[in-house]
A protein has these predicted regions:
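Non-catalytic terminal and connector segments of soluble metabolic enzymes
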Residues: 1-337
Length: 337
């Protein structure tokens, strides 16, 4: 069976309350599907209504989407693989599978409180995550999301949800977390949730060798000065991030997307750079504090789980290098459906 695309919609409540990591980790590990792309959305009332119309088999979900306030920030994950829609739907659950003990993601991350009166009307319904029931619903929803992705998605702004001034910072979830479908990428996001920052940008990508050279260019002189094999060490960093050493590439190959998957995240809030760096931990996992990303997920100075920008200036430099503002969400969907 050929690969197909499906999607999962992480609701505004789940996104705001830091449930994204747990949802993502369980969805990827249980399904074995590839995280193809993703995007943060602030959907309009029209987009929410159009999406609701694709969930005819889930009336509670359809009503929930219609009732969401416009511009409520949410996260869409696009998954790829054999029989993707059916696999994701069985793991996410639906309107009828929210009363169990963790069999589905809705059991764990959603809530349904029904009246004890005859008829059992829903008093409170928060699904946490929504997924189409089949391939046809998936294609219909993906087309709507792709068409709206420029105007209603991207790197958003959550400053109105904070009482203090805010800043944005960049995180890269490194390739060591994607060796096989696992809970690791979600675990990294889960540990960052303790910062209380808003997740306002999300983009899976493959770093090219040329991007790696520019991204890690500032450390080359330091490594060459301090280590006899400094340039070789620098090339190893790029090979880890992009899949190939610069010296192994012809000039024309350097700009091609690399073989190693990464996910770029943008967090926003007061003192975002410092808070994320604290949650990240020391570059050397052996020296990192307990409960940090690098202590939990790192093994060496290079293979250490994640990268985070160390200054506002580097946030701008690094997001520019990896072209985070470019919208490949719609092109990946167009190529896959």
């Amino acid at each position: 069976m050929a690969d197909q695309l499906t999607y999962a919609f992480i609701t505004p409540t789940a996104l705001r309350k830091g449930r994204t990591g747990g949802i993502l980790g369980r969805l990827i590990s249980r399904s074995g599907l590839e995280l193809n792309t993703g995007r943060v959305f602030a959907p309009s009332s029209k987009l929410l209504g159009d999406l609701a119309a694709t969930f005819q088999s889930q009336p509670k979900t359809a009503a929930y989407l219609k009732a969401l306030p416009a511009d409520s920030q949410s996260l869409v994950l696009v998954l790829k693989g054999e029989d993707a829609a059916a696999k994701a739907a069985s793991i996410v659950g639906d309107d009828a599978s929210m009363g169990g003990r963790g069999e589905t993601l809705r059991d764990t991350f959603g809530d349904l409180v029904e009246s004890t009166q005859e008829g059992g009307q829903a008093v409170y319904f928060e699904p946490g995550i929504i997924a189409p029931a089949n391939a046809a619903e998936a294609v219909a929803g993906l087309k709507l999301l792709a068409a709206a992705s420029d105007a209603e998605g991207g790197i958003l702004d959550a400053s109105a949800t904070f009482t203090e001034s805010t800043e944005k910072t960049l995180v890269l979830i490194k390739p060591d977390n994607f060796a096989f479908p696992s809970t690791r990428p979600g675990g990294v996001i889960d540990l960052f949730a303790r910062t209380g920052l808003a997740l306002v940008g999300f983009k899976p990508f493959h770093m090219s060798v040329a991007q790696g050279e520019e991204f890690y260019g500032p450390v080359l002189d330091f490594l060459v000065e301090k280590l006899p094999d400094g340039r070789s060490q620098w090339e190893s960093i790029i090979a880890f991030m992009a899949g190939k050493r610069p010296s192994e590439c012809a000039a024309g190959e350097k700009n091609a997307p690399g073989s190693q998957p990464c996910v770029a995240l943008i967090y926003q809030g007061p003192d975002a750079v410092a808070k994320i760096r604290e949650a990240l931990g020391s570059t050397n996992p052996a020296n990192a504090a307990h409960g940090t990303i690098r202590k939990e997920f790192g093994t060496t100075i290079m293979i250490n789980g994640a990268h985070a920008s160390d200054s506002i200036e580097n946030v701008a430099r690094e997001t520019g290098i990896i072209r985070l503002q470019e919208n490949d969400f719609k092109t990946k969907i167009a190529a896959g459906i």
